[in-house]
Curated annotation (Swiss-Prot):
NCBIfam families: tktlase_bact. Mg(2+) binds at D154, N184, I186. It comes from Vibrio parahaemolyticus serotype O3:K6 (strain RIMD 2210633). Its EC number is 2.2.1.1. CDD domains: TPP_PYR_DXS_TK_like, TPP_TK. Binds 1 Mg(2+) ion per subunit. Can also utilize other divalent metal cations, such as Ca(2+), Mn(2+) and Co(2+). Binds 1 thiamine pyrophosphate per subunit. This is Transketolase 2. Transmembrane segments: none annotated. Thiamine diphosphate binds at H65, G113, P114, L115, G155, N184, H259, F436.
Length: 663
């Protein structure tokens, strides 16, 4: 059957889906249909009957607005995505939301839409493939051997994150990464020459990529030859495909008119005529389905891989068991027992250290149990303390390690980690200063939206970093992380809370975690075994009064020590004071009402929250009758002790505030 005719099935479904929804982006799917047909029918190794097959090729639609392209491909190939699902494009609770979302339709490898993040996720997937291959493959047994393919448009290339990711991909020699640039010269505002005149091929050559320029995106033979050349090259490849946006539309192709709006009934009829597509809306002939179906070939490819894996399992039974455990996202059998013992030992052996150092100690202890750890930092390893004795850096010619030097690429790092998590086989963690999570915020939001694991170590968490000043001192960042749905945020007060936070982050597979650590040393707090267990609840009674409290001090991180000292002074003066350590407000909020009431009794309205972050966040816990000792402005450049005094983080100020409240 004519390849163009098979590609036209994508064009028809895409324009019909957008028309039915009365919103969407038909131009990119219609322009890239020929490329998609060649890639999916002649190259992509996948099995529609098992979208989770470990050694499948990954496909990422980085220009996620063209979502009808991937929905059409999944439907035509035989995935569990019906024609009714396509008719429900962009409708409430459908499997086909406006941008592709991970966890809705089978075969969607990542959520895309915020431009540039798809290509960056793909870099992470390609890194995970290369690292897993280095760790598990043996001579004659290539059980990890797959490609990551990406479609991306001009918008992805304009976004700065594409530079961060593609630069690193070239440095690390990710030869299994193949990207297709949809070079149609059109963005929402019109022809891109006025705002995007880069020499993109030269840009990627400078990154160390293999570049195939000037491929006719509507010539199946040229596309096929380019893919074959890309697969044979040891470098990541950019295939520059010249396409016509809205291909087939007689009056709107080649213009921004077809980028982000339905073609309209009249133009769709004209397009059907132009393409020689004589079938009605959402009608696909059986012979077209038969040509497109990947069920039989996909099952055969997976069966062949299963045979390879059986041979590997016979030769390397322990490695095979470890591979299965890791790709299934399971922790080692001895994890719970050993991790809990590590925490108990820390409580029994107090140390007054910075929580960033406590974090490194947790990595040292837990890392020995977790070969799946894949760490990293955005060029701040000596400050974030993210390397431990078992850390081994990934290098282009040796990917058997477990640590990535991301360079100064906070956004790229975080979105790459999303790709690593989505690929499977690793527990990724990265790091930067808390202030610079701002650069990476949207990628962490995407992790929360996708319900995937992404552990970020954010150090230098307050004015406590001192002399570097307000450019580096976070104020509103902790609150913004806490306010992000499905984000775990922890600000521990000592080495024990730090280890508990790390343990929970490692165990939590369905959400990202922000671990917020101090630069300065923090005093370890005494606790009973029950209190240690209660840390996981996010908030707990650290020090209590004799009888019912008349005042509750709530604190996090470096301010817990301050709250304890103030409570001791107030208690000595006859006040009944409870200290609540609340390292994770979101974990505390998830506890049942009885527990929350036991910790923060509603009839004790005299409450003070103490945190070197934005003050307004804490009204939810202290009420309008309470007080907050927090930040209401940016910081200053000065030694940390002077700043804490200037902004009121002193025992004297807490005590005086308490007395005013109780007066």
């Amino acid at each position: 059957m004519d390849r163009k005719y098979l590609a036209n099935a994508i064009r028809a479904l895409s324009m019909d889906g957008v028309q039915q929804a009365n919103s969407g982006h038909p131009g990119a799917p219609m322009g890239m249909a020929d490329i998609a047909e060649v890639l999916w029918r002649s190259h992509l190794n996948h099995n529609p009957s098992n979208p989770e097959w470990a050694d499948r090729d990954r496909f990422v639609l980085s220009n996620g607005h063209g979502s009808m392209l991937i929905y059409s491909l999944l439907h035509l190939s035989g995935y569990e995505l019906s024609i009714d699902d396509l008719k429900n494009f962009r409708q409430l609770h459908s499997k086909t939301p406006g941008h592709p979302e991970y966890g809705y339709a089978p075969g969607i490898e990542t959520t895309t839409g915020p431009l540039g993040q798809g290509i960056t996720n793909a870099v992470g997937m390609a890194m995970a493939e290369k690292a897993l291959a280095a760790q598990f493959n043996k001579e004659g047994h290539d059980i990890v051997d797959h490609f990551t393919y990406v479609f991306m448009g001009d918008g992805c290339l304009m976004e700065g994150i594409s530079h961060e990711a593609c630069s690193l991909a070239g440095t690390l020699g990710l030869g299994k990464l193949i990207a297709f640039w949809d070079d149609n010269g059109i963005s929402i505002d019109g022809h891109v020459e006025g705002w995007f005149s880069d020499d993109t091929p030269k840009r990627f050559e400078a990154y160390g990529w293999h570049v195939i320029p000037a491929v006719d995106g509507h010539d199946a033979d040229a596309i096929n030859a380019a893919i074959e050349a890309a697969k044979a090259d040891p470098r990541p490849t950019l295939i520059c495909t010249k396409t016509i946006i809205g291909f087939g539309s007689p009056n709107k192709s080649g213009s921004h008119d077809c980028h982000g709006a339905p073609l309209g009934a009249e133009e769709i009829a004209a397009t059907r005529k132009e393409l020689g597509w004589e079938h009605g809306p959402f009608e696909i002939p059986q012979e077209v389905y038969a040509e497109w179906s990947a069920k039989e070939t996909g099952a055969a490819k997976e069966a062949a891989w299963n045979e390879k894996f059986a041979a590997y399992e016979a030769a390397y039974p322990e490695l095979a068991a470890e591979f299965k455990r890791r790709v299934n996202g399971e922790l080692p059998a001895e994890w719970e027992e050993k991790a809990s013992q590590i925490i108990a030992d820390l409580q029994a052996n107090p140390a007054n250290i910075a929580s960033r150092k406590a974090s490194q100690n947790a990595l040292e202890a837990f890392g020995a149990l977790l070969p799946e750890f894949m760490g990293g930092s955005a060029d701040l390893a000596p400050s974030n303390l993210t390397m431990w004795s078992g850390s081994k850096s990934l290098e282009a010619n040796d990917f058997s390690g477990n640590y990535i030097h991301y360079g100064v690429r906070e956004f790229g790092m975080t979105a790459i980690m999303n790709g690593i998590a989505l690929h499977g086989g690793f527990v990724p963690y990265g790091a930067t200063f808390l202030m610079f999570m701002e650069y990476a915020r949207n990628a962490m939001r995407m992790a929360a939206l996708m319900k995937i694991q992404n552990i970020q170590v954010y150090t230098h968490d307050s004015i406590g970093l001192g002399e570097d000043g307000p450019t580096h001192q976070p104020v509103e960042q902790i609150a913004s992380l806490r306010l992000t749905p499905n984000m775990n945020t922890w600000r521990p007060c000592d080495q024990v809370e730090s280890a508990v936070a790390w343990k929970l982050a490692i165990e939590r597979k369905d959400a990202p975690t922000a671990l917020i650590f101090s630069r300065q040393n923090l005093a370890q707090q005494p606790r009973s075994a029950e209190q240690v267990a209660d840390i996981a609840k996010g908030g707990y009674i650290l020090k209590d009064s004799e009888g019912k409290p008349e005042l509750i001090l709530i604190a996090t991180g470096s301010e817990v020590e301050l709250a304890v000292k103030a409570a001791e002074q107030l208690t000595a003066e006859g006040k009944k004071v409870r200290v609540v350590s609340m390292p994770s407000t979101d974990a505390f909020d998830k506890q049942d009402a009885d527990y929350r009431e036991a910790v923060l009794p509603s009839d004790v309205t005299a409450r003070i929250a103490i945190e070197a972050g934005i003050a307004d966040f804490w009204y939810k816990y202290v009420g309008f009758d309470g007080r907050i000792i927090g930040m209401t402005t940016f910081g200053e450049s000065a030694p940390a002790d002077q700043l804490f005094e200037m902004f009121g983080f002193t025992v004297e100020n807490v005590v005086n505030t308490a007395k005013e409240l109780l007066a």
